[in-house]
Amino acid sequence: MTRIAKPLIKSAMAAGLVTASMSLSTAVAHAGPSPNWDAVAQCESGGNWAANTGNGKYGGLQFKPATWAAFGGVGNPAAASREQQIAVANRVLAEQGLDAWPTCGAASGLPIALWSKPAQGIKQIINEIIWAGIQASIPR
């Protein structure tokens, strides 16, 4: 193999790994640990999934109406089922991490550092893979 071909093959392999990992990311998005939403609701609202305490937040997980609507919730969160609230909470978690529940996120049972900014963690992993591919392609 020539001196040029070997680094090109390594770069192509690194690019393939990045592409494959990005393709699989949606397939394995739910493969990790799941939050204990009942524990978060217990902390947020005393476990009352129909909570409406007058503080501007509603439901067991204490959604603000704007957040609820932005992540696919319909109507008032306090009137939604536990399952509907959890579905919206999972979408909020994917984008905002546990920071969306600053007081009670720790009750989820998930490591806060891992779930604080999930998109940032994915970006960091991809950058590390790309950097490793670049370093591997540099002739020695």
Swiss-Prot record:
BP GO terms, sorted: negative regulation of gene expression; quorum sensing; regulation of cell population proliferation
Induction details: By the metal chelator phenanthroline via Rip1.
CDD domains registered for this protein in UniProt: RPF
Record's keyword annotation contains Secreted: yes
Regions that span the bilayer: none
Pfam family, one: Transglycosylas
Gene Ontology CC terms, in alphabetical order: extracellular region
Primary localization: secreted
Superkingdom of this protein's organism: Bacteria
Keywords tagged on the record: Hydrolase, Secreted, Signal
Hydrolase among keywords: yes
The family this protein is said to belong to: Belongs to the transglycosylase family. Rpf subfamily.
Protein name: Resuscitation-promoting factor RpfC
Organism, scientific name: Mycobacterium tuberculosis (strain ATCC 35801 / TMC 107 / Erdman)
Higher taxonomy: Bacteria, Bacillati, Actinomycetota, Actinomycetes, Mycobacteriales
